[in-house]
Amino acid sequence: MARVTVDDCLKRIPNRFQMTLAAAHRARQLANGATPLVDPEKHKPTVVALKEMGAGKVGLEVLNRGQA
């Protein structure tokens, strides 16, 4: 597996504070039962959320989709 780094995510969302908010929100959604958009491979929700962001499958729009 390719290691997900903050730099990979910052290419998609240049503001690190917005990126952190989006990743935390998406991780909360995943922990509450949302379907992962990438292969979770037994990773924790936070890692899966970062993998989704690095792959370009999730962005700032996750903050506007309602409650986690």
From Swiss-Prot:
The gene is rpoZ. Keywords: DNA-directed RNA polymerase, Nucleotidyltransferase, Transcription, Transferase. Signal peptide: none annotated. SUPFAM superfamilies: RPB6/omega subunit-like. This is DNA-directed RNA polymerase subunit omega. Its EC number is 2.7.7.6. One of its GO terms (biological process) is DNA-templated transcription. Belongs to the RNA polymerase subunit omega family. Pfam families: RNA_pol_Rpb6 (PF01192). It comes from Dechloromonas aromatica (strain RCB).
